[in-house]
């Protein structure tokens, strides 16, 4: 099959290098199925997709193909909180226990919303053995975390809350807004703005979903460099298979830190709006002053779980080491395996990449590097 039959969509001529990098992900970097989108000044200038969404059936990746984006989901959750703050329903300085009294147990009474969203709460995982079935119960998981003693003094360090960030955020969100993050996204972003963004996979969207593929033996515990107690709790309790998103249990669950399903087009459109002072379809999703707070580093340094230097905003990854280009103002989130989405306010762009072939790199996936080099040179 020629590459012209693999790649579909549109790419403005001035971004031909980006289109070529996407094609080369298939011809040179073993991509299987993927989509790439970029919005500049509110205009969709790159909208490409290609390959297959299921290697066994050879079904083509289509314009509306959805795929699990793992922790790229966290950027959606961060955006939802920024929308709540913009609506005056809470502030980032608000103490979590003000809205969720049970959370104050075990010395957690002074943890703020900002601390919770920036992975400072010390609740990055469970110490007691945990099953997949327990992970799929968001409310019960949130209750366990509310009763838990932090793994480090809150506010003194940060450790990536890979899954638990979703339970914590969802429970707080419901206490404040009334709706779950899944329902909020469905109503405020999908229904109102047509964005193909979901927490979990709605049953009626099953035919659009890509099948995740990974190398044999790949697990979530490989993402931790040294399995300390904190890392074991965060990354290996339980150990997750990268193909878990293909299962009915995962798709039905509500884990707004990891089981988001999306198109690159929808992610790029959302981040494109955040790159333009929070305006989407002439609607002020997020106030500029709130966006500035949400994307300002709350804490930085070596992450206790990931073992690399990270700057955390209020749920967003703040740009460092040119992860999201050259602008220090850029922000976004990346997911296990290679998906990512970000905004660059200096260039007024939003970009997203989604795929179904799980890469093994913690940082520096060759597909991502090629895409970023094509944008920033």
Placement of each model-derived feature along the sequence:
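Active-site Gly/Thr loop motif
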Residues: 210-264, 292-347
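Short, gly/Ser/Thr-rich active-site loops of penicillin-recognizing serine hydrolases
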Residues: 255, 276, 295-302, 361-377
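Active-site SXXK
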Residues: 16, 22-23, 42, 65-94, ...
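Active-site helix/loop module of the DD-peptidase/beta-lactamase fold
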Residues: 63, 68-72, 84-128, 146-147, ...
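Active-site-proximal alpha-helical segments within enzyme catalytic domains
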Residues: 119, 165-172, 258-280, 339-356
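Flexible glycine/proline-enriched surface loops and loop-helix/loop-strand junctions
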Residues: 62-64, 148-155, 165-168, 247-256
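Short, charged, amphipathic alpha-helices and their helix-cap/turn boundaries
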Residues: 48, 131-153, 179-196, 238-243
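Short, conserved catalytic-motif segment at the N-terminal edge
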Residues: 6-69, 91-94
């Amino acid at each position: 099959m020629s590459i012209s039959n693999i790649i579909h969509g549109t790419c403005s001529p001035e971004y031909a290098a980006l289109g070529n990098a996407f094609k080369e992900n298939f011809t040179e970097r073993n991509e299987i199925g993927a989509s790439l989108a970029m919005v500049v000044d509110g205009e969709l200038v790159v909208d490409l997709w290609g390959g297959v969404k299921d290697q066994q059936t050879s079904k083509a990746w289509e314009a509306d193909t959805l795929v699990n984006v793992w922790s790229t989901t966290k950027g959606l959750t961060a955006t939802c909180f920024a929308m709540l703050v913009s609506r005056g329903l809470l502030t980032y300085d608000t103490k979590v226990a003000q809205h969720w009294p049970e959370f104050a147990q075990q010395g957690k009474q002074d943890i703020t919303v900002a601390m919770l969203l920036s992975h400072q709460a010390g609740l990055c995982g469970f110490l007691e053995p945990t099953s997949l079935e327990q992970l799929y119960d968001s409310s019960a998981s949130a209750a366990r975390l509310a009763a838990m003693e932090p793994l480090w003094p809150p506010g003194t360090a940060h450790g990536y809350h890979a899954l638990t960030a979703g339970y914590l955020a969802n429970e707080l969100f419901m206490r404040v807004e009334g709706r779950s993050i899944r329902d909020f996204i469905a109503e405020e972003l999908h229904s109102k703005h047509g964005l193909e963004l979901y927490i979990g996979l709605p049953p009626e969207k099953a035919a659009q979903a890509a099948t995740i593929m990974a190398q044999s033996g790949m697990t979530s515990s490989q993402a931790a460099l040294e399995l300390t107690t904190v890392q074991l709790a965060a990354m290996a309790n339980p150990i997750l298979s990268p193909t878990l998103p293909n299962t009915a249990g995962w798709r039905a669950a509500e884990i707004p830190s990891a089981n988001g399903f999306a198109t690159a087009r929808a992610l790029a459109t959302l981040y494109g709006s955040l790159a333009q002072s929070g305006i989407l379809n002439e609607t002020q999703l997020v106030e500029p002053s709130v966006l500035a707070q949400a994307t300002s580093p709350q804490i930085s340094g070596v992450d206790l779980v990931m073992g690399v230097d990270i700057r955390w905003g209020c749920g967003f990854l703040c740009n460092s080491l040119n992860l999201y280009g050259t602008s220090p103002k850029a922000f976004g989130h990346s997911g296990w395996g290679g998906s990512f989405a970000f905004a660059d306010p200096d260039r007024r762009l939003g970009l997203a990449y989604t795929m179904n072939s799980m890469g093994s790199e913690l940082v520096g996936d060759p597909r991502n590097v090629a895409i970023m080099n094509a944008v920033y040179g």
